[in-house]
Design a protein with these regions (language model features):
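Cytoplasmic (intracellular) domains, linkers, and terminal tails of multi-pass ion channels
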Residues: 1-53, 68-72, 77, 124-142
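Pore domain of cation channels
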Residues: 10-15, 84-91, 97-141
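Outer-pore turret/helix-boundary of cation channels
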Residues: 55-89
Length: 142
């Protein structure tokens, strides 16, 4: 259980840093470039933000794999098969709080699932706020 708790804190910190750096990179690099039209900068914001979310989902999927296979902290039931795609699918479903329920955690790994859902909620909210701020900057006609 201590290993799962440590993994939760580690992934929470990593995801926060990844998102912070990506949004900072987008803000400062877009402000300095005149080569991209104003409204097109919003497409870059959306794609960059999605890339950050995808990276975070991938990190959580890898952590599920390691926690299950290396540390034996639980397993998955339901429609789960032993492919990385299943880990990615479950991670994306959890991160976005979609929660179909076709795959479910068993054991100590459940705590990790809750932290991923909370992390996804906060990061998606952060992206929405950032996108709004960038829209107020770039969407209006000059």
């Amino acid at each position: 259980m201590i290993t799962a708790g440590f993994a939760c804190v580690l992934l929470l910190v990593l995801c926060t840093l990844i998102h912070y750096e990506m949004l900072g990179f987008l803000k400062f690099s877009l402000a300095r470039t005149a080569a991209i039209p104003r409204r097109a900068k919003l497409i870059v914001v959306i794609l960059g933000s999605m890339g950050s979310h995808f990276l975070q989902i991938t990190l959580f999927a890898a952590a599920y794999f390691v926690l299950r296979d290396r540390f034996g902290l639980g397993t998955f039931g339901g429609e789960f098969n032993d492919s990385f795609f299943s880990f990615m699918y479950y991670s994306a479903e959890t991160y976005t709080s979609l929660g179909f329920g076709d795959i479910f955690p068993i054991g100590a790994i459940r705590m990790f699932t809750g932290i991923e859902a909370l992390t996804g909620l906060v990061m998606i909210g952060w992206t929405a706020s950032f996108t709004y701020l960038e829209m107020t900057r770039y969407w209006a006609d000059p």
